[in-house]
Amino acid sequence: MESVGHSLLTLSVLCPVGALLLCWVGSVLLGAGLLPSLTLSTRDPSTTLSRTPWLVVLVPLLVLWGWRWLSRPMELLRSPEEVGYIPERGRSRAQTANLVRRRRMKGELPPIYPNGWYRALDSHLLPPGTVQDCTLLGEQLAVYRTLEGKVYVVDAYCPHLGANLAVGGKVVGDCIECPFHGWQFRGEDGKCTRIPYAEKVPDFAKIKTRPSCELNGMVFVWYHCDGIEPTWSVPEQEEITKKEWVYHGRTEHYVNAHIEEIPENAADIAHLDFLHTPGILSGVDLRYTKSRIWDFVKHSWKVQWIPEPAPNKHCSQMLLAHSILLFGKHFPLLDVNVVARQVGPGIVFLHFKHAFLGEGVIVHCVTPVEPLLQKVSHSIYYQKNIPALIPKFILKAECIQFERDVMIWNNKKYISKPMLVKEDAAIQKHRRWFSQFYSNNSPQITFQQEGLDW
């Protein structure tokens, strides 16, 4: 990913320089008679456009610009109010979103923060010697990287007088230094190692640290309500580590729903044939997705959801066969098989393989920001020998389908005891599987007339 960034930076510098160089070379070659002049015939034969090297400059410049545009990773970051709401007359998007959130019935909710690993941020956003602020599970964290490349995660607020270590804090060795009084805390165990104006550092001077890991181009943080150390690991996608698959972009959305509702979609097989059958040209507004204008393109889905046995009982799989119908006709060459492997409550690897479009993975991560606000990211990695346009199209198509779900989630009520038919059996099975990520002390919220009661 870093090499892609360097390539784009280099190209952005070289494009204007290359254009000037091509212009100069073209002028020299034309002056020497080594290139043919371009003649523009008009009614007046004496009018000619000659000795102009525009073609020599324009064509390579357009090629360079096109290559740069196609190679650049697609970054589509949506704000919380941007997707999933029907605008109300006389109100802005933000006002509409806030109104819907206030008046929506919440239902009888499960615990709000399941135990597990969660994505904090992407690795390329944390260069050596820097610190980033991160909101995770209702808390503020400081994520920093030492000059040697090691990543640590600590509470953002200094236990001395509460300064935010991620706002002006400095990385010193393997410690982070508070911008307020210069206290330094070691990332490994949180121990304060230096107070500039104190003769001795007291033993009680510590900051809370969080278990973390870095792989697949991301930094993950472990959460357990009882402070238990990690009981399972985030799997490594070897093709990403070996750079056989390269990064082509990500999307990021905010969803106003309980975290469990998002992965539950994998077991809600019936919704695929109803919500996601219309082609992507039908858009994301559910009022219009079934318009007959785009009815000639339809998606077909065959899905199976299964939990994995021990020792991987924290994992489950959705096996999906996708096909496209054009004017009611099936084209087998467009079929795609997807294996979506859920690891814990907040990480999914959507591995897809196509006969001639190649192979790749979308890493789907759900991170609770606060009780009913989830940050959902989709990062795509694809075979490096496949044109970048292919994975970017796949990511955009995934984004459109996902935003249809967002419109449902942002406006729905959670029902703890849903009215199910036998064809919905996988939903109840998924809820039993997901319950393993809650424990007796998992935080809960209840909603009363007077407000929010924690």
Curated annotation (Swiss-Prot):
Xref: InterPro entries: Cholesterol_7-desaturase, KshA-like_C, Rieske_2Fe-2S, Rieske_2Fe-2S_sf
Catalysed reactions listed for this entry: cholesterol + NADPH + O2 + H(+) = 7-dehydrocholesterol + NADP(+) + 2 H2O; cholesterol + NADH + O2 + H(+) = 7-dehydrocholesterol + NAD(+) + 2 H2O
Residue ranges of the TM segments: 13-33, 47-67
Keywords in alphabetical order: 2Fe-2S, Iron, Iron-sulfur, Membrane, Metal-binding, Oxidoreductase, Transmembrane, Transmembrane helix
Alphabetized GO MF terms: 2 iron, 2 sulfur cluster binding; cholesterol 7-desaturase (NAD(P)H) activity; metal ion binding; oxidoreductase activity
Top-level division of the source organism's lineage: Eukaryota
Pathway linked to the protein: Steroid hormone biosynthesis; dafachronic acid biosynthesis
Main location: membrane
Cofactor binding annotation: Binds 1 [2Fe-2S] cluster per subunit.
Biological process according to GO: cholesterol metabolic process
Residue positions binding [2Fe-2S] cluster: C158, H160, C178, H181
Cofactor entry: [2Fe-2S] cluster
One Pfam family here: Rieske
E.C. no: 1.14.19.21
Primary enzyme class: oxidoreductase
Location of the protein in the cell: Membrane
Membrane topology: Multi-pass membrane protein
GO cellular component: cytoplasm; membrane
Domain spans labelled Rieske: 117-221
CDD domains in the record: Rieske_RO_Alpha_N
Family: Belongs to the cholesterol 7-desaturase family.
Record's function text: Catalyzes the production of 7-dehydrocholesterol (7-DHC or cholesta-5,7-dien-3beta-ol) by inserting a double bond (desaturating) at the C7-C8 single bond of cholesterol. This reaction is the first step in the synthesis of the steroid hormone Delta(7)-dafachronic acid.
Protein name: Cholesterol 7-desaturase nvd
Naturally occurring in which organism (per UniProt): Xenopus laevis
Gene: nvd
